[in-house]
């Protein structure tokens, strides 16, 4: 099947942090769209699975993640969004994850983060990177169209709810999430926005978020949500934690962060969460990829885009 060998070649290229051609990006996005459009707003995922937080274009650290966590398709992965922006390799990072999704659709689940948005990527780097590497905004346009198709959340074995940011005062049940029309740019407010922007906070009820979008939500809100939906815990990303992961509210909410030495200067470690078939948890902590394994982006990259 020529399609698969083409795809495998593209995956190999992307694994080496080499760009694929613009027309290949177009075809890849078209295939990805066909797969993603079938997924639910609350995508069902079966254990065993390894859950990952923000990556933010840190390609060599994503390779390190695969080194410590196992490769696709041997390991089943769930990535909770924020694939792009801030790091140097958003293009290669997102396209590799997308190519793996198309090649092994049942072994990798990608859900949307607040950075999977046209507006945010124009400010935090992905737009400029696409322009620099391809000489036009076409690839950015293909990718941002795919962002609109990404699922908003996932549920592992019916028990662990995974979302990029957190809860929303407009949402009490998973069924209410299922009714959202997700195929759009992330709105400035409302339930879809809240899922991607909110944060847990040591408070009760709802609070105003300093981020200017989403809400702060307290332990009582979580207890109510988890009981109403018969789930054990909420797993989310969205916030840098220096130790790679952090428990909140008596282990009912977990933050997982998977970008080590964030922005190449924060000095944090990263974590991924391995869940076995009984949902037993094991955290794998990892550090930034050693300096010698990363091509530090030169000031004037060679063959930066395809004419």
Swiss-Prot record:
As stated in the Swiss-Prot or TrEMBL entry, residues carrying the post-translational modification Leucine methyl ester are: 307
**Where does the record say this protein resides?**
Cytoplasm; Cytoplasm, Cytoskeleton, Microtubule organizing center, Centrosome
- Give me the comment on cofactor binding: Binds 2 manganese ions per subunit.
Q: Which GO terms describe its molecular function?
A: metal ion binding; protein serine/threonine phosphatase activity
Is Manganese a UniProt keyword of this protein?
yes
Q: What is a single cellular component term in the Gene Ontology annotation?
A: centrosome
Question: At which positions is Mn(2+) 2 bound?
Answer: 82, 114, 164, 238
Q: Which cofactor does it need?
A: Mn(2+)
Cite the InterPro entries for this sequence.
Calcineurin-like_PHP_ApaH, Metallo-depent_PP-like, PPA2-like, Ser/Thr-sp_prot-phosphatase
| This protein's UniProt keywords | Cytoplasm, Cytoskeleton, Hydrolase, Manganese, Metal-binding, Methylation, Protein phosphatase
The protein's name = Serine/threonine-protein phosphatase 4 catalytic subunit B
Q: What's its top-level EC category? A: hydrolase
Gene symbol here is ppp4cb
State the function annotated in the UniProt record: Protein phosphatase that regulates many processes such as microtubule organization at centrosomes.
UniProt xrefs under Pfam families? Metallophos
- Active-site residues annotated for this sequence: 115 (proton donor)
Self-association and partners: Serine/threonine-protein phosphatase 4 (PP4) occurs in different assemblies of the catalytic and one or more regulatory subunits.
Q: Can you tell me which residues bind Mn(2+) 1? A: 54, 56, 82
Tell me which EC number(s) this protein carries: 3.1.3.16
Q: Which reaction does it catalyse?
A: O-phospho-L-seryl-[protein] + H2O = L-seryl-[protein] + phosphate; O-phospho-L-threonyl-[protein] + H2O = L-threonyl-[protein] + phosphate
Q: Return the similarity comment.
A: Belongs to the PPP phosphatase family. PP-4 (PP-X) subfamily.
The superkingdom listed in its UniProt entry is: Eukaryota
């Amino acid at each position: 099947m020529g399609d698969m060998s083409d795809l495998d070649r593209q995956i190999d290229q992307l694994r080496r942090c080499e760009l694929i051609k613009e027309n290949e990006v177009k075809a890849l996005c078209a295939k990805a769209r066909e797969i993603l459009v079938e997924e639910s707003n609350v995508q069902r995922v079966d254990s065993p699975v390894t859950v990952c937080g923000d990556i933010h274009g840190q390609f060599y650290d994503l390779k390190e993640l695969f080194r410590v966590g196992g490769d696709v398709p041997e390991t089943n992965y769930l990535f909770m969004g924020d694939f792009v922006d801030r790091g140097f390799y958003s293009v290669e990072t997102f396209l590799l994850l997308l190519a793996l999704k198309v090649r092994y659709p049942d072994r990798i689940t990608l859900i949307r983060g607040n950075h999977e948005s046209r507006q945010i990527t124009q400010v935090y780097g992905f737009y400029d990177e696409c322009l620099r590497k391809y000489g036009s905004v076409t690839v950015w346009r293909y990718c941002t169209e795919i962002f609109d198709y990404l699922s908003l959340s996932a549920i592992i074995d019916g028990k662990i709810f995974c979302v990029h940011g957190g809860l929303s005062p407009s949402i009490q049940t998973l069924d209410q999430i299922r009714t959202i029309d997700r195929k759009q740019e992330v709105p400035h407010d409302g339930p879809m926005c809240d899922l991607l922007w909110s944060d847990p906070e040591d408070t009760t009820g709802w609070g105003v978020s300093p981020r200017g979008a989403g809400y702060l939500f307290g332990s009582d809100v979580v207890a109510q949500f988890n009981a109403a939906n018969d789930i054990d815990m909420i797993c989310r990303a969205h916030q840098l934690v220096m130790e790679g992961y952090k428990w909140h509210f008596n282990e009912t909410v977990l933050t997982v962060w998977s970008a080590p030495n964030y922005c190449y200067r924060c000095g944090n470690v990263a974590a991924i969460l391995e869940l076995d078939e009984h949902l037993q948890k094991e955290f794998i902590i990892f550090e930034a990829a050693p300096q010698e394994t990363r091509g530090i982006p030169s000031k004037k990259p060679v063959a930066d885009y395809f004419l």
